[in-house]
Amino acid sequence: MATTISTQRGQVYIGELPQDFLRITPTQQQQQVQLDAQAAQQLQYGGSLGTVGRLSITVVQAKLAKNYGMTRMDPYCRVRLGYAVYETPTAHNGAKNPRWNKVIQCTVPPGVGSFYLEIFDERAFSMDDRIAWTHVTIPEGLREGSVVDEWYSLSDRQGDDKEGMINLVMSFANMPAGMHMSPPVVLMPTVYQQGVGYIPIAGVPTAYSPGMVPMGMPAAPTVTPQEAPCSEEDLKALQDMFPNLDREVIRTVIEAQQGNKDAAINSLLQMTEEL
């Protein structure tokens, strides 16, 4: 029971302090901002959705129907799979025949069987202009270990399937049950002024109110599958065997087969037969 005693300066309150003493209760808006930030970070790494596997997409090149604008276009690709967005580097002066040879590693959430690909022309003094797009269904054969090398039709202003074609090489690696990619422990900076802060790694803008102390997000330790390294000797040997295939395409196939050289040769033979 609390008691009071008298001193020269007045009465002093003695006893147990309440648990919420000097604590600022966050408003509903502040709590929602914090929950949104955590959800965005989980979605960035597929933590809340789980992962059924990893899709490797090699964006090789495109043959476009038209060069939009007065100068040669600087195209780049944007891939949307689930909640994640990936981009290739810009093919400067690529015009109608840009080449990227960019390998994109995508985590595939459960229930996702396709992805959306867009090609943009990078502009210096205005918004980037979308040139073409396509909707790609992930082939069922990928889950059986095969590699798909296909040309996909592009659509936009010229009409459906009339904007040219894009060459994609895809492979799929199954992820064992219970394994998923998650971010490391992230400690948010303490902000005491109204403003906009950026969450490390995820890069999601979040507003903090005065007195609000953001909380860290501890992540459960997970075990990630390790792939066999792709040696330069194996890569060079397969490149000599398949001189018509791009070096990055061969590297992607070796990584998809987890360093198994015989399986990679079978996949590459299948690709050359389809060409």
Swiss-Prot record:
GO terms for molecular function: ubiquitin binding; ubiquitin conjugating enzyme binding. PROSITE patterns: C2 (PS50004), CUE (PS51140). One of its GO terms (cellular component) is early endosome. Transmembrane segments: none annotated. It is found in: Cytoplasm; Endosome; Early endosome. Residues 35-152 form the C2 domain. Residues 230-273 form the CUE domain. One of its GO terms (biological process) is autophagy. A motif (AIM2) lies at residues 151-154. PANTHER family: TOLL-INTERACTING PROTEIN. This is Toll-interacting protein. The lineage of its organism: Eukaryota, Metazoa, Chordata, Craniata, Vertebrata.
